[in-house]
């Protein structure tokens, strides 16, 4: 009887802990969803994303905890009013976490994507030639390719958009960087646009690719449609950036 009571107590404790963790995850996701609730001078107020980060850190379930932190670090660094040094710290925290957790969850497309996205954001803060010489651009390319292989549709074709944008915008640097290709940009960005035409960045990059590859009539048509759209509430800042 005593053994049964102890077992029952342990079971109740285990269930309670799981319910608490699940509750924290749901709260964290809600705060993340509301990350654009207050916009000030073109940036999101950090209150909701700070709460999201705090709550994601309390979650036990994986890989949800890691994915939540990675996307929250990226949002806070990219879309709230923080210094460049704080941006670099947030991106670096995400890169380190993703590198660690990608070994634990090697087949998780979301972790692979946020690893590439945070690394790309960090690289935007340093000189492109320096990033290329140090192999950073090649590493980001490899991470994006891995994310595409695992889940090309994740985050509205996020990895396709990222890698396609790199092929389109990263310059060829003699003896250092020779792989950027308009042909690859065309292939990747067309696919991203087809998968998620509602994402303003997909539309913008697709139209830009059309312009660069001399399909100006089609490019103009896509651009004209884009600027008539309204930013989506949950993606307000990124949509606004490309719609304007």
What function would you assign to each model-found segment?
Residues 30-54, 71-104, 114-146, 159-192, ...:
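Short coil/linker segments at helix-helix boundaries
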Residues 19-23:
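Boundary at the C-terminal end of the N-terminal hydrophobic targeting segment
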Residues 57-72, 79, 108-110:
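Short, charge-rich amphipathic alpha-helical segments embedded
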Residues 65, 111, 156-159, 202, ...:
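TPR alpha-solenoid repeat register
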Residues 60, 105-107, 152-154, 197, ...:
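Short coil turns that delineate tetratricopeptide repeat
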């Amino acid at each position: 009887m005593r053994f049964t009571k102890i077992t029952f107590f342990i079971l109740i404790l285990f269930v309670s802990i799981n319910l608490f963790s699940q509750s924290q995850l749901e709260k964290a996701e809600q705060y993340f969803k509301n990350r654009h609730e207050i916009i000030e001078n073109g940036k999101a107020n950090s209150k909701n994303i700070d709460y999201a980060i705090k709550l994601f850190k309390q979650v036990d379930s994986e890989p949800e905890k890691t994915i939540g932190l990675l996307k929250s670090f990226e949002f806070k660094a990219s879309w709230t009013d923080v210094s460049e040094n704080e941006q670099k710290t947030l991106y670096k925290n995400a890169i380190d976490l993703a590198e660690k957790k990608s070994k634990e969850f090697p087949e998780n497309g979301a972790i692979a994507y946020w690893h590439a996205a945070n690394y790309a954001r960090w690289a935007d803060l340093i000189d492109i030639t320096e990033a290329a010489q140090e192999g950073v651009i090649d590493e980001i390319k490899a991470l994006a390719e891995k994310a595409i292989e695992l889940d090309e549709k994740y985050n509205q074709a996020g990895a396709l958009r990222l890698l396609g944008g790199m092929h389109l915008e990263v310059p060829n640097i003699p003896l250092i960087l020779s792989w950027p290709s308009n042909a690859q940009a065309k292939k990747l960005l067309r696919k991203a646009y087809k998968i998620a035409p509602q994402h303003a960045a997909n539309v913008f990059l697709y139209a830009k690719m059309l312009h660069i590859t001399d399909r100006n009539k089609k490019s103009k048509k896509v651009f004209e449609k884009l600027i008539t759209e309204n930013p989506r509430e949950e993606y307000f800042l990124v949509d606004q950036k490309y719609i304007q």
